[in-house]
């Protein structure tokens, strides 16, 4: 009887979470040199050059999970950062938001090509992806090629362009914000901690894919 009750409670949490709105804010920024104080907002199909510096800021629901994944121009995968919901998950309806930097200023290196970034935000744990990346990081080159296919398949599971029953909508914020508060310290409002866009999903999944054209 206790097992049945526990299982029912678990299902109630999962179903309840899926019915909640889910979404995150992000800021994908670039600058020409590390010492530059001029930040540029990046979006899908933006052009970057070798030597440019990139930064990613994320604001997400504290009771959710986030994976930020990078696929290089030569097809290598890297889990840039991930955040897991607290284990003592109490009330996902509180809508508390956590802001953090998923990628600090990092220069983009050759070769040129398409640089792909995936932002995945879910209420359910991203356990499969996390385990695949652990194996990928330890595997030899030949093994990584096989695991890369499995990683992409796992990513595609959350991609609304591939899964017809999913939907995510991204839009630019009217004003850049820092930690959830409008920032007025600079003329253009864009500082190192700014988030500039919002992605809203449904059924417990929000997904954003950004491809940068590296020249």
Predicted regions span which residues?
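Sec-dependent N-terminal signal peptides
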Residues: 3-16
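Secretory-pathway glycoprotein ectodomains that are cysteine- and/or Ser/Thr/Pro-rich
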Residues: 17-55, 59, 65, 69-215
């Amino acid at each position: 009887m206790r097992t049945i009750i526990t299982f029912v409670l678990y299902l109630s949490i999962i179903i309840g979470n899926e019915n909640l709105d889910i979404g995150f804010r992000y800021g994908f920024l670039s600058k020409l040199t590390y010492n530059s104080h001029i930040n540029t907002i990046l979006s899908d199909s933006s052009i970057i050059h070798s030597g440019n510096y990139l930064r990613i800021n994320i604001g997400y629901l504290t009771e959710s999970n986030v994976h930020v994944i990078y696929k290089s121009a030569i097809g290598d995968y890297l889990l840039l950062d991930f955040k897991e919901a607290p284990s003592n998950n109490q009330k996902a309806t509180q809508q508390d938001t956590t802001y953090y930097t998923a990628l600090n200023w990092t220069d983009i290196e050759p070769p040129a090509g398409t640089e792909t970034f995936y932002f995945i935000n879910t209420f359910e744990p991203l356990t499969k992806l996390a385990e695949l990346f652990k194996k990928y990081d330890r595997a030899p080159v030949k093994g990584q090629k096989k695991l890369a296919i499995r990683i992409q398949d796992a990513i595609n599971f959350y991609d609304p362009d591939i899964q017809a029953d999913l939907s995510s909508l991204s839009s630019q914020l009217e004003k850049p914000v820092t930690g959830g508060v409008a920032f007025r310290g600079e003329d253009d409002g864009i500082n190192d901690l700014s988030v500039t866009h919002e992605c809203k999903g449904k059924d417990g999944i929000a997904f954003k894919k950004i491809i940068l054209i590296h020249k």
